[in-house]
Each structure stands twice: as C-alpha cells, then as structure tokens.
C-alpha cells in the first residue's frame, strides 16, 4: 500500500483487495 496521503486512495486500495 503506497502512502499517498489521501484517505480516498487508501480506502480504494482496501476495497480492491477486500471482496465487496
């Protein structure tokens, strides 16, 4: 997980790795 400093990116990454 890259630290972009944006919560939206972090959330997007989690939703990508985790099943819907």
Curated annotation (Swiss-Prot):
Basic and acidic residues bias locations: 1-13
GO-annotated biological processes: defense response to fungus; killing of cells of another organism
Signal peptide start-end: none
Region (Disordered): 1-20
Keywords of this entry: Antimicrobial, Fungicide
Purpose: Has antifungal activity against B.cinerea, M.arachidicola and P.piricola. Inhibits HIV-1 reverse transcriptase.
Record-given protein name: Cicerarin
Species, as recorded: Cicer arietinum
Organism phylogeny: Eukaryota, Viridiplantae, Streptophyta, Embryophyta, Tracheophyta
